[in-house]
Protein backbone atom coordinates (compact mmCIF):
# COMPACT_ATOMS: atom_id res chain seq x y z
CA UNK A 1 0.00 0.00 0.00
CA UNK A 2 1.05 3.60 -0.58
CA UNK A 3 0.11 6.31 1.87
CA UNK A 4 0.06 10.10 1.90
CA UNK A 5 2.76 11.50 4.16
CA UNK A 6 2.39 15.20 4.93
CA UNK A 7 5.66 16.79 5.98
CA UNK A 8 5.45 20.08 7.84
CA UNK A 9 8.86 21.68 7.34
CA UNK A 10 10.26 25.12 8.22
CA UNK A 11 9.99 26.02 4.51
CA UNK A 12 6.41 24.88 4.07
CA UNK A 13 4.13 21.86 4.03
CA UNK A 14 4.36 19.17 1.37
CA UNK A 15 2.49 15.90 0.90
CA UNK A 16 4.30 12.98 -0.69
CA UNK A 17 3.42 9.40 -1.59
CA UNK A 18 5.22 6.84 0.58
CA UNK A 19 4.86 3.07 0.14
CA UNK A 20 4.49 1.12 3.38
CA UNK A 21 7.88 -0.54 2.78
CA UNK A 22 9.79 2.72 2.23
CA UNK A 23 11.27 4.87 4.97
CA UNK A 24 9.74 8.35 5.16
CA UNK A 25 13.18 9.96 4.76
CA UNK A 26 13.90 8.00 1.56
CA UNK A 27 10.50 8.85 0.06
CA UNK A 28 11.01 12.52 0.93
CA UNK A 29 14.39 12.54 -0.81
CA UNK A 30 12.91 10.87 -3.89
CA UNK A 31 10.32 13.66 -3.91
CA UNK A 32 13.11 16.24 -3.90
CA UNK A 33 12.79 17.31 -0.27
CA UNK A 34 15.93 18.09 1.71
CA UNK A 35 15.37 16.78 5.23
CA UNK A 36 18.02 16.52 7.96
CA UNK A 37 19.70 13.19 8.63
CA UNK A 38 23.02 11.76 9.73
CA UNK A 39 23.35 8.05 10.49
CA UNK A 40 20.38 6.71 8.47
CA UNK A 41 20.31 3.78 10.92
CA UNK A 42 17.92 4.96 13.64
CA UNK A 43 20.70 5.49 16.17
CA UNK A 44 20.97 9.28 16.35
CA UNK A 45 18.54 12.20 16.51
CA UNK A 46 19.42 14.23 13.40
CA UNK A 47 16.29 13.22 11.47
CA UNK A 48 13.81 13.54 14.35
CA UNK A 49 10.27 14.51 13.47
CA UNK A 50 7.01 14.59 15.41
CA UNK A 51 3.91 12.71 14.32
CA UNK A 52 0.83 14.92 14.70
CA UNK A 53 -1.65 12.61 12.91
CA UNK A 54 -1.55 8.95 11.95
CA UNK A 55 0.99 6.31 12.94
CA UNK A 56 4.34 4.98 11.80
CA UNK A 57 6.35 1.79 12.35
CA UNK A 58 9.82 2.66 13.65
CA UNK A 59 10.81 -0.67 15.19
CA UNK A 60 14.32 -0.31 13.77
CA UNK A 61 15.10 2.81 15.80
CA UNK A 62 17.38 2.50 18.83
CA UNK A 63 17.75 6.11 19.98
CA UNK A 64 14.40 7.39 21.26
CA UNK A 65 13.16 6.33 24.69
CA UNK A 66 9.60 5.25 25.45
CA UNK A 67 8.57 8.69 26.71
CA UNK A 68 9.79 10.35 23.50
CA UNK A 69 7.97 7.80 21.36
CA UNK A 70 4.76 8.26 23.37
CA UNK A 71 5.10 12.02 22.84
CA UNK A 72 5.03 11.40 19.08
CA UNK A 73 8.70 11.72 18.17
CA UNK A 74 9.90 9.67 15.23
CA UNK A 75 13.17 9.01 13.44
CA UNK A 76 12.24 9.55 9.80
CA UNK A 77 15.19 7.48 8.53
CA UNK A 78 13.67 4.27 9.94
CA UNK A 79 9.94 5.10 9.91
CA UNK A 80 7.46 3.29 7.67
CA UNK A 81 3.97 4.81 7.33
CA UNK A 82 1.16 2.61 8.66
CA UNK A 83 -1.45 4.85 7.06
CA UNK A 84 -1.77 8.48 6.06
CA UNK A 85 0.44 10.41 8.45
CA UNK A 86 1.47 13.98 9.24
CA UNK A 87 4.99 14.61 10.52
CA UNK A 88 6.56 17.87 11.65
CA UNK A 89 10.21 17.72 10.60
CA UNK A 90 13.35 19.36 12.03
CA UNK A 91 12.44 18.49 15.64
CA UNK A 92 15.85 17.35 16.93
CA UNK A 93 16.17 20.33 19.29
CA UNK A 94 12.85 19.42 20.94
CA UNK A 95 14.08 16.08 22.33
CA UNK A 96 17.38 17.08 23.93
UniProtKB/Swiss-Prot annotation:
Alphabetically ordered keywords of this record: 2Fe-2S, Chloroplast, Electron transport, Iron, Iron-sulfur, Metal-binding, Plastid, Transport
PROSITE patterns the UniProt entry points to: 2FE2S_FER_1 (PS00197), 2FE2S_FER_2 (PS51085)
Entry's localization field: Plastid, Chloroplast
Cofactor(s) required for function per UniProt: [2Fe-2S] cluster
Disulfide bonds: none
Gene Ontology terms: cellular component: chloroplast stroma
Matches recorded under Pfam families: Fer2
Ranges of residues in domain 2Fe-2S ferredoxin-type: 3-93
Known function: Ferredoxins are iron-sulfur proteins that transfer electrons in a wide variety of metabolic reactions.
PANTHER family, A to Z: FERREDOXIN, FERREDOXIN-2, CHLOROPLASTIC
Family, similarity comment: Belongs to the 2Fe2S plant-type ferredoxin family.
Protein name: Ferredoxin-1
Amino acid sequence: ATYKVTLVTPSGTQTIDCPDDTYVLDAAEEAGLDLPYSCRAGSCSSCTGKVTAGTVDQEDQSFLDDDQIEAGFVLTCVAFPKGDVTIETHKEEDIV
